[in-house]
Amino acid sequence: MNKKSILKKPKNAQSTQEKQLITWSKSLIDEARSRLQYDFFALEWIEKLVDPVSLETLEEARKYLRKSDYDQVVKERKLVNLCGYPVCPYEPKQQTRYKLEDSGMKVYGGLNYYCSKDCFLKSCQYMVELSDEPLWIREDAREAMKQHLDPRQDEAFRKELENKKIEDVRLLLQALPVGYKAKVGEIVEHPLANEQS
């Protein structure tokens, strides 16, 4: 007589659970990958704002930055000796932390990151208006990521770059003396044929 254990699950149930676990872990990995791409996108904007930018660029960045991201921009700009307000091209001035005013002593802790009180106030106003929501929750950021990660755009950009390189080579060839054009032309026009021989 064949005895069956009541504690063991049937093989079909176990394989179904394993499949569900695999599916769940794949979706979790995809979600983590997606969030990481959003973080890289925000990092690109942080890097873009380290150099002085126009007001339009700063307004565009508002859609993709959180307050903590903007704080990183201010700190990075201080490291490269620029005012913390991304529009300003000047160096920050060494400020004292405390100032005496009519109403008494006031603490200005963040002024060392800025060239003036005006830039400090503009930067604070900008930061207050930024969202605290993560980037992957915002609808406008999702649309931008779809465009940013569109493989057709990347392919079109690569083709455009290749065409530019070919045009640059042709311009260089035109500037060469007559005797050199034949040798260089063979190399440029038929690189694989020359490599095989």
UniProtKB/Swiss-Prot annotation:
GO CC, one annotated term: nucleus
GO MF annotations, alphabetized: RNA polymerase core enzyme binding; RNA polymerase II CTD heptapeptide repeat phosphatase activity; zinc ion binding
Enzyme Commission number(s): 3.1.3.16
Cystine pairings recorded for this chain: none
Main location per the UniProt record: cytoplasm
Designated name of the protein: Putative RNA polymerase II subunit B1 CTD phosphatase rtr1
Pfam families: RPAP2_Rtr1 (PF04181)
Keywords per UniProt: Cytoplasm, Hydrolase, Metal-binding, Nucleus, Protein phosphatase, Transcription, Transcription regulation, Zinc, Zinc-finger
Residues bound to Zn(2+): C83, C88, C115, C119
Similarity section: Belongs to the RPAP2 family.
PANTHER family: RNA POLYMERASE II SUBUNIT B1 CTD PHOSPHATASE RPAP2-RELATED
Zinc finger (RTR1-type): 60-139
GO biological process, alphabetically ordered: signaling; transcription by RNA polymerase II
Function: Putative RNA polymerase II subunit B1 C-terminal domain (CTD) phosphatase involved in RNA polymerase II transcription regulation.
Enzymatic reactions: O-phospho-L-seryl-[protein] + H2O = L-seryl-[protein] + phosphate; O-phospho-L-threonyl-[protein] + H2O = L-threonyl-[protein] + phosphate
InterPro entries listed in its UniProt record: Rtr1/RPAP2, Rtr1/RPAP2_dom, Rtr1/RPAP2_sf
The species this protein was found in: Schizosaccharomyces pombe (strain 972 / ATCC 24843) (Fission yeast)
Compartmental location: Cytoplasm; Nucleus
